[in-house]
Regions:
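Charged docking surfaces used in two-component/phosphorelay signaling
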Residues: 187-361
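N-terminal Rossmann-like NAD(P) cofactor-binding subdomain of oxidoreductases
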Residues: 1-206, 237, 309, 315-316, ...
Length: 361
């Protein structure tokens, strides 16, 4: 790419916004030129607006420190400076739906980390390795919005990234029933232990809205594009419980699964290790070389050892074994703010760029 695409971050001061900024430092295709946040941050430098709330392990990139934060509600002004935006705004769902459409209507593509548009019929919800073909929905969406280049694309919930890739890899064996429990990191709530001390040595057996997302969103990701809309996968039937656990980064899933035709363990592992999709074929900058790794040790995957596999963009599976009630059971692990949030959105933007949906204005 001769000239980098100009990127804006909506909701730049929050945890996911910060993750976008750290991931996009030195990105070969994209450059952060605009940061936008709430009116109370507008007019300050990014460094001032974030203050002591920088939550990343790496220092704040020099290139963004002195950027003046724009008011996210001043859509025309923000849009005029960028080729596309990443959205990580903290608003009500109705407000998010409205503001993301406003940006799209200024002919600015929106790649969103938010859940507001995940069930909008003509908005693709994509894990690029699994369902990059769903980006073709954008043509239908542009007709509705009356745009030529503006659109919205979203990534699914962080909780599903630890097991949905395995379901996709095993598609030919017909996953039929899935029982999953997720053990979710506190960064998924935008928190650290410093600002959520009651999570130390604690487990909370409830995360609002998360179980429904974890049961339904995989069916859209695994669905097929027919006549300008997504036909949801009818199987597997998924039931889920979601727990908040005292871990900073990394969502773990304990999964039981039945198949239409029961494969061997060796077949399942082979499918995991060989699974790849558009990001690997197109050699996108953020794509993991190997999307899913299988770990044969009894005590893996572990958050401390494995959460940063492939820079947090890969998924780790382990403990695959036969079960007395189900065909198999296994453990999955993914990085919830990299693959599950900002990193997954960056990979979507790379895929959209490679496919020609995102271009310089």
């Amino acid at each position: 790419m001769e000239k980098k695409l100009r990127v804006g971050i909506l909701g730049a001061t929050g945890m996911v916004g910060q993750r976008f900024i750290s991931l996009l430092e030195n990105h070969p295709w994209f450059e952060v030129v605009t940061v936008a946040a709430s009116p109370r941050s507008a007019g300050k430098t990014y460094e001032e607006a974030v203050g002591g709330r920088w939550k990343m392990d790496t220092p704040m990139p020099e290139g963004v420190k002195k950027l003046i934060v724009k008011n996210v509600n001043e859509v025309e002004e923000v849009s005029s400076t960028v080729d596309f935006v990443f959205s990580a705004v903290d608003m009500t769902k109705d407000e998010i739906r409205a503001i993301e459409e406003e940006y799209a209507k200024t002919e600015t593509p929106v790649v969103s980390n938010n859940s507001a548009h995940r069930w909008t019929k003509d908005v693709p919800m994509v894990v690029p390795e699994i369902n990059a073909a769903h980006f073709d929905l954008i043509k239908t969406q542009k007709e509705r919005l009356g745009t030529t280049r503006g659109f919205i694309a979203v990534k699914p919930n962080c909780s599903i990234q630890s097991y949905t890739p395995a379901l996709a890899a095993w598609k030919e064996f017909g996953p039929k029933e899935v029982v999953v429990t997720t053990y979710q990191a506190i960064s998924g709530a935008g928190k650290t232990f410093k600002d959520w001390p009651e999570m130390i040595e604690n487990i909370i057996p409830y995360i609002g809205g998360e179980e429904e997302k974890s049961e339904k969103e995989p069916l859209r990701v695994l669905g097929t594009l027919e006549n300008g809309e997504i036909k949801l996968a009818e199987e597997p039937k998924i039931t889920c419980q979601c727990l908040r656990v005292p871990v900073l980064n990394g969502h773990t899933a304990a999964v039981f699964i039945n198949f239409e035709k029961k494969p061997t363990k060796e077949q399942l592992i082979e499918k995991l290790e060989s699974f790849k999709g558009f990001p690997q074929e197109a050699e996108l900058p953020s794509a993991p070389k190997q999307f899913i790794q299988y770990l044969s040790e009894d005590d893996r995957p572990q958050v401390k050892a494995d959460v940063n596999y492939e820079n947090g963009m890969g998924v780790s599976i382990g403990r695959l074994r036969e079960d007395s009630m189900y065909d198999y059971k296994f453990i999955g692990l993914s990085h919830n703010t990299v693959r599950g949030a900002a990193g997954g959105a960056v990979l979507c933007a790379e895929a959209l760029t490679a496919k020609g949906y995102i271009q310089a204005k």
